[in-house]
Amino acid sequence: MSHLALKDLFSGFFVIDDEEEVEVPDKQQQVNEAPAKEQSQQTTKQNAIKSVPQKSASRYTTTSEERNNRMSNYSKNNSRNVVTMNNATPNNASQESSKMCLFEPRVFSDTQDIADELKNRRATLVNLQRIDKVSAKRIIDFLSGTVYAIGGDIQRVGTDIFLCTPDNVEVAGSITDHIENMEHSFD
């Protein structure tokens, strides 16, 4: 805002009209002139507002153009830093899928360690033979939810022994049928 525009704005507020200085002895005349005074004050304010210069629209268009140029330059500069996931995952996936963790939890709180290994895409074999049945059921419920969340699978491979696998591990076949046959052959 320029200096002159500010001066015009403030001078419009402090202008004294000749009509305002005249004293009116009659109350009837004061009542009639009160709306006239308000109207003259409103026109003074409107004139002061009109004297304020409007912001130009060209200022905003240059800003958006500059921003678009900066964003396009930014994306061009950073395009060489992008690495495709297909190139990065084969080595990592083969290393992660080759490791299997064995667990024999004694208390329910040990289940968190099993879930962490599953989240890190490692297969786990869980032996629940040394824990009470109620805790074993809670552990299986928890691991079933974990495996479901990561898109994996849980299978019973023996008496109170479970295989939990993440989505990058595929289990072919079923061991349960073989174990049942082996148990019956020893009887």
Swiss-Prot record:
It is found in: Cytoplasm. It comes from the Bacteria. Residues 21-97 are annotated as: Disordered. The keyword Cytoplasm applies. GO terms for biological process: division septum assembly; FtsZ-dependent cytokinesis. The keyword Cell cycle applies. GO terms for cellular component: cytoplasm. Residues 38-63, 70-97 have a biased composition (Polar residues). Keywords: Cell cycle, Cell division, Cytoplasm, Septation. Cell division protein that is part of the divisome complex and is recruited early to the Z-ring. Probably stimulates Z-ring formation, perhaps through the cross-linking of FtsZ protofilaments. Its function overlaps with FtsA. Homodimer. Interacts with FtsZ. Belongs to the SepF family. PANTHER family: CELL DIVISION PROTEIN SEPF. This is Cell division protein SepF. It comes from Staphylococcus aureus (strain NCTC 8325 / PS 47). The lineage of its organism: Bacteria, Bacillati, Bacillota, Bacilli, Bacillales. The gene is sepF.
